[in-house]
Amino acid sequence: GSSLQKALAICQDTRYPYYCFAQLLKQADMISGETIAGLAGRTIAFIPTNETLKNALAGKEIPGADKLMVYEDGTLGLIDSGNGLTSDEKIELKKYISNYFLVASSVPSACYPGSKMENGEYVNYSGNTIVYKDLGTSLSIQLKDGTKVVQVSGKYNYFPFCYNDGCFHFIESLLM
């Protein structure tokens, strides 16, 4: 079967709506071959769209990623090619990006409106708590100590993209 980790790890094509997220994983040194460092077992990911990440990078809203941008052709890279991320910036970016992955051992199934996944609090890979809400016709997530409720994109009728090692949803804003 196909793997969520592999799909993200090998993504080089800007046409994929998760391309920018995959490139942030690479910039944070989280990719090892076809796997994502630190992810084990089943995972549920909430992935900001390329457009969301492009705007967030331009606004310097992503911790550890101030030196990154999305170019006109849609590729993600350094603002100044001679000035890569420091190890501290990579650690900061990794800690932030890890917020978007839920530990699936704490999650009963793929989530969609009406699924078996209960409203409640779930731990993410940064060790922070995500508040998950099934609103009946839509889904939302929020960092427990965060200020922003993030809506899951309805573009695909709130159904997740499923893989043998997990699933993901798109979101159209950042966790703050």
Residue ranges and their predicted role:
Residues 1-176:
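Mature, structured domains of secreted/extracytosolic soluble proteins
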